[in-house]
């Protein structure tokens, strides 16, 4: 489906998380055929005795379901693996929705790492993206409740909710400090591929995640661009948090010769399974791939495969570095255990976990692209000081205004705000709130859209290949 592309780093004025980061494989994968060693009942004598002791001796009434759920959670937590988790019925339903259909929430992929709940990437066009949420932002509180000690699904359950309702997030961003956001939840669409024809017959294709329909969406996008005369392609995987592994394999095959490696899977016994391109490649025209620190999991599989097996240049920043594979087993009551079952390796056998993939052509965005969102519901005025004032000063400076960045809302800054309001035909109050803040976010978005230095580098690189 054709649609005007939006940059993954858009800063806007509204706001509104989805699911945990995972590289998910479905039941028809050979990985699910791996057998595990059986465990004798004697191994669970201690567990059974503890259960009986709690049932008989605890001073209050107990709930069998809660005890069993707690035991499973404890076993999963003992693995010390942020990608393995136990999901109750509600959490499992939310997880399924994020890879198969639209869902309601704020639209951001999150993970638990070293006891912290972190943003992997906001989903394209989501309230989270519009709010200016960035990869690596740490979630501190949800509606005033600390997420410390929670697993990722517990945190997600707090963040998600019905369309139109709001959730308050307290985030911490490296180099900025704590940020408070009030985000309106919305329906997060399932569409994952967006394409358009750029100048010089360059087909730009943005892939936002890997869901059940992504391979078909990509094929349709390529067919459409081919009919329009595309002579080369830019695949934009920036901010893509991953998803279904088989989709990444199918999509990679479109750009890789039959018989060449796409990826490898390594099991705990050391055996490896090599996934190869099983069909003739579809795209033979020059291609480049854009990546950044929000490119993760299945997106990293595709990026690495195209580079190592088709010599496609990667452009941008070092990727996230998520190199494990999960399966999900559903139980009769609707609960699910999502478990890491293997490592995945690149086509050449490299494990990129916690390291990421370094691009061949480094390209960074302007510093102002990393500025946090300013809440339009809050008021900043003369006499105020602090981080948010400093952010506003940096934004106006990026837009060309002469601003002293000193974190102080002094008379000089009041004058600058009035200049901005006059230019944008707003009431000249010198106060930053409401429509003024909203307009500031929109104007910064426009500047970012016009100064996508990574996309410019991708176009420059592709032209040399064409």
Swiss-Prot record:
Induction: Is expressed only during vegetative growth. The keyword Coiled coil does not apply. This is Carboxy-terminal processing protease CtpA. NCBIfam families: prc. GO terms for cellular component: outer membrane-bounded periplasmic space. Belongs to the peptidase S41A family. It comes from Bacillus subtilis (strain 168). The active site is at 297 (charge relay system), 308 (charge relay system), 322 (charge relay system). Keywords: Hydrolase, Protease, Serine protease, Signal.
């Amino acid at each position: 489906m054709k649609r005007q592309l939006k940059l993954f780093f858009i800063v806007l004025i509204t706001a509104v998380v989805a699911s945990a980061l995972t590289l998910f494989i479905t039941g028809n994968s050979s990985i699910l055929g791996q057998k595990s060693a059986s465990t004798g009942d004697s191994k669970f004598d201690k567990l059974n005795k503890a259960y009986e002791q709690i049932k008989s001796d605890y001073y209050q009434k107990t709930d069998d379901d809660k005890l069993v759920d707690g035991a499973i959670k404890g076993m999963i937590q003992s693995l010390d693996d942020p990608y393995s988790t136990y999901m109750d019925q509600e959490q499992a339903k939310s997880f399924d929705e994020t890879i198969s259909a639209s869902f309601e929430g704020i639209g951001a992929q999150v993970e638990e790492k070293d006891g912290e709940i972190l943003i992997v990437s906001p989903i394209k066009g989501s309230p989270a993206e519009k709010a200016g949420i960035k990869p690596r932002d740490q979630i501190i509180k949800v509606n005033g409740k600390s997420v410390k000690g929670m697993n990722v699904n517990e945190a997600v359950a707090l963040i998600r909710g019905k369309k139109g309702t709001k959730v308050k997030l307290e985030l911490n961003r490296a180099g900025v400090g704590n940020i408070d956001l009030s985000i309106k939840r919305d329906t997060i669409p399932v569409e994952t591929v967006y394409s358009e024809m750029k100048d010089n017959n360059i087909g730009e294709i943005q892939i936002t995640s890997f869901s059940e329909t992504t391979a078909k969406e990509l094929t349709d996008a390529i067919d459409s661009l081919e009919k329009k005369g595309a002579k080369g392609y830019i695949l934009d995987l920036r901010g893509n948090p991953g998803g279904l592994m088989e989709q990444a394999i199918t999509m990679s095959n479109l750009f890789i010769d039959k018989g060449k490696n796409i990826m490898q899977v390594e099991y705990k016994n050391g055996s490896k399974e090599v996934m190869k391109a099983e069909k003739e490649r579809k795209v033979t025209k020059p291609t480049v791939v854009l990546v950044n620190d929000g490119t993760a999991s299945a997106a990293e599989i595709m990026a690495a495969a195209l580079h190592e097996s088709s010599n496609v240049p990667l452009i941008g920043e070092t990727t996230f570095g998520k190199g494990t594979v999960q399966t999900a087993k559903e139980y009769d009551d609707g609960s699910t255990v999502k478990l890491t079952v293997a490592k995945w390796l690149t086509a050449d056998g490299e494990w990129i976990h916690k390291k990421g993939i370094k691009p061949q052509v480094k390209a960074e965005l302007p510093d102002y692209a990393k500025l946090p969102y300013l809440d339009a519901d809050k008021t900043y005025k003369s006499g105020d000081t602090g981080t948010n004032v400093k952010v506003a000063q940096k934004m106006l400076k990026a837009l060309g205004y002469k601003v002293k960045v000193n974190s102080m809302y002094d008379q000089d800054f009041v004058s600058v705000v009035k200049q901005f309001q006059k230019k944008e035909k707003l009431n000249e109050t010198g106060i930053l709130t409401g429509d003024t803040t909203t307009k500031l976010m929109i104007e910064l978005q426009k500047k970012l859209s016009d100064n996508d230095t990574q996309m410019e580098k991708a176009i420059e690189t592709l032209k040399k290949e064409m």
